[in-house]
Amino acid sequence: MGIKNLNNLLRKKCPDVFIETHLSEYAFKKLAVDVSLFMCKFKAICGDRWLTSFVNLVQCLRRNEIHCVFIYDNGAPNEKSGEREERVKQREKTEQKVIELDMALDKYYMTGEIEPILMDLHDKIEKQSVPVQRLLTKAIQPPKFDIKSVKEKIEKMKNYNIKITPEDFQKTRELFDILQIPYYIAPLEAECMCADLCKRGIVDGVLSEDTDVLAYGSPIFLTKIDTKNDTCVLIKYEEVLESLKLTQEQFLDLCIMCGCDYNKNIPKIGGEKSFNYISKYKSIEEIERNMNIDVTVLNHVRTRELFTNYERHEVKKILYCGSPDFEKVKEFMKDNGINIDIEKLRSSFVHEDLIFVDE
């Protein structure tokens, strides 16, 4: 989930901290990547072709001469259990709805009868896609039932209701071994280890979609990667603090007040109000004291600890990416149904006149 609405707040308060950057700006540098985050993203967008997306990601980074290291989760704090339970309930709810929609879809194809559940979905699609100025006209002249858009929406619901298995993660490890890409298992959460590696100077940045990276204080946060155009959005932690005129401690309290995977925000106090309160009172304790607000839901003392006092991985140095055996790569791609240009992949790994040596 990341920090709730933090991106929106930053876009409003300090849009200049979002810098579109070509990936080549990080050539010869090391980036830490959270496997689970991209696994969820690729499965949701690409379905069964998710492993191909990992190949494309690695290929994109290597053709820009970036050395990536992938980090695996190894559990989560107890404080995250509530958030996990909510996700499970939502997934089960979506699964049941998809089953009912599929049954209604079958009935439509057999009888032409439109069940209410299909019509409700159709109406929601229409409201999302039709300009406001046309709503009155559509109210007078109801649209025809568009079965194609309904079917596409159901398929998207299936894709977003993803399931990830231990075998999926094992398959990525096999891929990274074949491609000679280093990877590690985090002491607990991968996002935490990624940020910590950057804070310790072991890697030069974190590639992620999760704003938790900023709450952990990672100096360099690369996000919104575009593997076709080789670009990303760069956010520098120190520039965020400077633009918001907050200290590290105040910014963390802001993130906690926004809400994250470990807590919920105070009802009716969103990102902007949280920012205004932190700017004025400097800490959650002072907000509670001066505003007479119940901050219990924030669980802020423990949440601060989770973002600052965590177990560190013992690694002191990350290896550079190696040179794959492309005959083995070719065999792996064939065995796993990955349709990719091997020569283009080879050219992404082979760069003239540069040899990286790990001391």
Description of each model-found segment:
Residues 13-31, 35, 60, 64-67, ...:
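Non-catalytic nucleic-acid-binding/docking modules located in mid-to-C-terminal regions
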Residues 213-216, 221, 227-234, 238:
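Conserved NTP-donor binding/palm subdomain of two-metal-ion nucleotidyltransferases/polymerases, i.e.
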